[in-house]
Amino acid sequence: MLIALSTSALQGAVNGFGSVMVTAYTTVGKLDQIVQQPYSSMATALGTYTGQNVGAGKDKRVWQGLRAAVLINFGFTLLMFVLVALFGEQMLGIFVRDQEVIHTALMGLRINSYFYGFLGLLYAVRGVLNGAGDAVYSAINGVIELVCRLAFAFVLIPKIGPMGCFLCGGITWVLASLVSVWRYAIGKWKTKAK
């Protein structure tokens, strides 16, 4: 939900590049939402799995589940990267027909596809943290993600133009996932459910 809010907040900056960019950005957002569905489902399943194992005192199984989820997400990420590389134009063509829009959107979709692995990692680790009862941190991390996305937009878009609209999301996914991994690694989540 926070990703959707920050994406909406960026719309004002995107609007400054004209209707082609607005349509391209919106189209890439639709495909990103489709890509996020397996990650989101994995996070939900991982949250339940984590809650059960933390409750049973089996913290080692939490790591095993997280590792398995990250590997599955990585496999899906590779699949999406290949699909975007080979069929990105056709994927975008599901939503729009204008070739100028497709060309611009393809640039954004390819940029985003480089960062999908971090998005999958972010969802998986947040799933564990939520399942372990560290939901407040996950909410705070989501707010930080929103703020970072907007900050990067205000820095990148004026400097590099339309590509900055797409890069700010990916860079934010990297930072948010690394902070979440750090939170997991320090083990504070182990004390939340007890």
Kindly label every feature range from the protein language model.
Residues 1-13, 17, 86, 90, ...:
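Short helix-kink/termination motifs in transmembrane helices of multi-pass secondary transporters
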Residues 7, 11, 24-88, 119-141:
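Small-residue-rich hydrophobic transmembrane alpha-helices
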